[in-house]
């Protein structure tokens, strides 16, 4: 099933963003579940109900389906190529200029989220560019990346990208 979705990558020549399977899982998980800690992914795929602290087959099944949707969005050729174009338009045209793979991962998760939320292409591109540059300048994902990813995606969901990005830029 995934082969048809990823076969275009075999001929892709861009080396700016070359994600491994961990990167793919991180982006898909952050985008679809609005969480950043892999321990939460493992718990959800096991059927963990965080409210009742029990395990339910229905949660495991829906979590697998949701993760699959996230992976499909990740490997979608149009999504991927537009994202790489956005990053290049910031001036980051070489892998050597990017200090943190997790800055790329979060920026891609943010792009997918904003598009799924119905934000227009131009507006979402603007936010993704600003987020990418800000996160690299301050080294946002260099240390405890999982905690920052988790915090950021939750704050974006709570406050909205406009307000949270402004808060981060003013901090």
Positions of predicted regions on the chain:
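Flexible coil/loop and intrinsically disordered segments
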Residues: 1-171
